[in-house]
């Protein structure tokens, strides 16, 4: 019987990675556009916060779709809070963009923006406000979000139309209906 236990430092650290310094803001668009791959977004957020924790950095996590006052805490604390976050059924808008600027952490910080790639009113202003506070890295999924139009009843059938954010090749999607 062999039992192996590892606890930091990392077994195979990324030797090319330069440790960061100062606070980190993990910014999530947080709307329906990121719902299809929310688990992957949370996994990436966890990895980014783990890197920050290894560098003894503090962090804050904010959703653009529902900005709340930034709590700058040890990055490991935020890792424990990630499971409590969920995508919201709306996109960020100009009001949430303006509110976000008011709740950003004080001083300089690095921003790691996990974006769903959908444009929204106020996005350029958000980016400018973030860039004024420090470097910004934007992470986007390779999958464009899909929106569903309201269901249309045609006799005894239901018709549903899906809209793509980009005019790329047709793709298959799955929709689950309950009720």
Please report, for each region that a protein language model flagged, where it lies by residue.
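N-linked glycosylation sequons
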Residues: 1-179
